[in-house]
Regions:
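Formylglycine-dependent sulfatase
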Residues: 1-436
């Protein structure tokens, strides 16, 4: 290097994405759900209260990967092929990073062909957590929307159907894959960029029984009591201004439900909570690995969700909610609670659909003490941030075609306790809804 200066060690990056999770669904955003690992990251990092996605799975993921609005990269109508853009995996690989992607992609393109050194995961939007493939011997037929049709990829190897071993549970297994990739690359000496895209807590509602059992007796109080307690904690934490009103609840009166309906709803929320709890446990495994590598202080960890909780109704199979042979969804009432204090849900361009918890943890840079910032931001800002911290360059062309300019701004000044300057307002659209 010029002047004989020592090389500056580049930071590692870990991006963790949850799926269909509400604003209030983790402890550090008001939930009664046990998420000690995310709470630890928040307590030693930065939380944003106005980080926005697109309200829908695949366009949010496209924005995160490319730094472009969905309309700019061809992902505004369906989870097909990208028509433009470059993935952050390619950009950071050119900057000397080992780029790794594990989990849900939700596009017909293979991330391995778009700049990630390794990809292991599901290219589809949702699948059975215990078995996304064909029925295994001695087990019930797995509840699925399209039996045996889910596409998985392992680097350049496409597998359809993917029928895993009987100990498979996607949240656990995908974390196993991520840990293997981290270990395999240690000898390279390269900084890593690892993107772990969980499908939790997207339906089907499925979890280990020991995790579900932790939430016995917690949700019998009903929708309103849980939502009100979450709202109170949000205010006490400083996430919400004391003057910020809670949106008008849209859930049914709990007492209007029959005993059978209440039991059904309690079970749904117990399983949903267990799925988030399980995800947090696995995030703890990732943190522990990075800590054991001696890299935690020099690793930027980002956590968010692709959209708010979903009010969609899916009912497949006859098994108990939570089991391999039942595909159940959270549905409207609990989704309203999950999105506290906001209104509406996934697929809606209201805060309940587009506002996500967002945690940034980077001890070498971010102020400690669990800071909270109310600056408006969007997934379009992630790519510029990664480019900034990695000393990377956004190319003018890719695969022989000109690239659209990035739509967002770097959040690095915000991580350093400064403000960001945005030249254009945030404006985005999904389906019939838009937001500015």
């Amino acid at each position: 290097m010029p002047g004989g200066a020592a090389a500056i060690k580049k930071p590692n990056v870990l991006i963790i994405l949850a799926d269909d999770m509400g604003f209030s669904d983790i402890g550090c955003y008001g939930a009664e759900i046990d998420t000690p690992n995310l709470d630890r990251l928040a307590g030693n990092g930065l939380r944003l209260t106005q980080m926005h996605n697109t309200s829908k799975c695949f366009p949010s993921r496209a924005v995160l990967l490319t730094g472009l609005y969905p309309q700019q990269c061809g992902m505004d109508h369906g989870p097909g092929k990208f028509t433009s853009g470059i993935f952050f995996g390619e950009v950071l690989r050119r900057a000397g990073y080992r780029t790794l992607f594990v989990g849900k992609h939700h596009s017909t393109d293979n991330p391995y062909d778009w700049g990630f050194d390794h990809y292991r995961g599901m290219r589809d939007g949702a699948a059975n957590y215990f078995n996304p493939g064909l029925q295994r011997s001695g087990e019930p037929r797995p509840a699925q929307k399209r039996y045996g049709k889910r596409v998985f990829a392992f680097d350049d190897t496409i597998v359809q159907p993917y029928t895993p071993p009987s100990d498979y549970y996607s949240t656990d297994t995908w974390t196993d894959w991520a840990l293997e990739l981290l270990e395999d690359g240690r000898a390279s000496g390269q900084p890593f960029c690892l993107y772990v895209s969980y499908q939790a807590p997207h339906d089907p509602l499925q979890a280990h029984e020991h995790d579900i059992a932790k939430y016995a007796g917690r949700y019998e109080v009903g929708y309103e009591a849980i939502a009100a307690a979450r709202y109170r904690r949000q205010q006490e934490m400083g996430l919400l201004d004391q003057r910020y009103p809670r949106s008008q609840p849209t859930h049914r009166p709990w007492d209007a439900l029959s005993t059978e309906e209440q039991a059904d709803q309690v079970r749904r929320m117990q399983v949903y909570a267990a799925m988030i709890d399980s995800m947090d446990q696995n995030i703890g495994r990732l943190i522990a690995k990075i800590e054991a590598m001696g890299e935690l202080d020099n690793t930027l960890i980002l956590f968010a969700a692709d959209n708010g909780a979903s009010a969609e109704v899916v009912r497949i199979g006859d098994g108990p909610i939570g089991a391999i042979d039942r595909w159940a969804s959270l549905e409207r009432d609990w989704a309203n609670v999950a999105n506290t204090p906001f209104r509406l849900f996934k697929n809606n361009s209201y805060e309940g659909g587009i506002c996500t918890p967002f945690i940034a943890h980077w001890p070498a840079v971010i102020r400690g003490g669990g800071a909270i910032d109310h600056t408006a931001a969007h997934f379009i800002d992630i790519m510029p941030t990664l480019i900034d911290i990695a000393g990377a360059e956004y190319p003018a062309t890719y695969r022989g075609e000109a690239l659209p300019p990035l739509s967002g701004v770097s959040l690095l000044p915000l991580l350093r306790d400064n403000s960001i300057q945005r030249g254009n307002p945030l404006y985005f659209q999904w389906n019939a809804g838009g937001a500015v």
